[in-house]
């Protein structure tokens, strides 16, 4: 355990940051799963409503990823990689293979 005041403060700050990081990552993963689920739903039954759902969920996931990068929860390359995964999945569903 910490013996001096600054070390105790660092422990408190690290715990606070850990909880913040955990909530950001959890909500980001949830939004990504919703986007992938919306893509699956659209591929099963294409329609305007399903397409709007895919685009809305992708927009929400992108926003959360960008905020996580801005706050420092994710590295910018990791954020770009996650956004690329989402974009590829959405593109695969919305644009039929030619």
Swiss-Prot record:
Domain of life (superkingdom): Bacteria
KW Transferase (keyword) present: no
A Pfam family this chain is assigned to: Ribosomal_S20p
Keyword terms of this UniProt record: Ribonucleoprotein, Ribosomal protein, RNA-binding, rRNA-binding
GO annotation terms (biological process): translation
A GO term, aspect molecular function: structural constituent of ribosome
Transmembrane portions of the chain: none
Disulfide bond sites: none
GO cellular component, as recorded: cytosol; small ribosomal subunit
HAMAP family, per database record: Ribosomal_bS20
Its job: Binds directly to 16S ribosomal RNA.
Family note: Belongs to the bacterial ribosomal protein bS20 family.
Name of this protein: Small ribosomal subunit protein bS20
């Amino acid at each position: 355990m910490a013996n001096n005041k600054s070390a105790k403060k660092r422990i408190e700050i690290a715990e606070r940051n850990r909880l913040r990081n955990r909530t950001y990552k959890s909500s980001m993963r949830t939004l990504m799963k919703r986007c992938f689920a919306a893509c699956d739903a659209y591929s099963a039954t294409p329609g305007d409503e399903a397409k709007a759902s895919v685009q809305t969920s992708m927009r929400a996931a992108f926003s959360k990823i960008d905020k996580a990068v801005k706050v420092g929860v994710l590295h910018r390359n990791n954020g770009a990689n996650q956004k690329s995964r989402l974009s590829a999945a959405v593109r695969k569903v919305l644009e039929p293979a030619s």
